[in-house]
């Protein structure tokens, strides 16, 4: 099945502690999850690695969030939208369900 949410898409969080926040997708994992910039931040306790000159401490980083909790953001309508597919010039393209506009 084709991916409805891809890397570099702007998405909005539908549920959870970050509900309503927007961010750019950094990575989509094969487990049906995505990592979004600035969303679902966790604190990781990291040990120092002297060989790589890396200090230890508490590091904030993005955790994966399930794709079902994300919706693609339609900038033209300024709201969350669903994704559909359409064949254009023999190629399958993603479109917004609300207005039929092609997603870049």
Swiss-Prot record:
GO terms for molecular function: rRNA binding; structural constituent of ribosome. InterPro entries: KOW (IPR005824), Rib_uL2_dom2 (IPR014722), Ribosomal_uL24 (IPR003256), Ribosomal_uL24_CS (IPR005825), Ribosomal_uL24_KOW (IPR041988), Translation_prot_SH3-like_sf (IPR008991). The keyword NADP does not apply. GO terms for cellular component: ribonucleoprotein complex; ribosome. GO terms for biological process: translation. Keywords: Ribonucleoprotein, Ribosomal protein, RNA-binding, rRNA-binding. One of two assembly initiator proteins, it binds directly to the 5'-end of the 23S rRNA, where it nucleates assembly of the 50S subunit. Part of the 50S ribosomal subunit. Belongs to the universal ribosomal protein uL24 family. This is Large ribosomal subunit protein uL24. It comes from Sodalis glossinidius (strain morsitans).
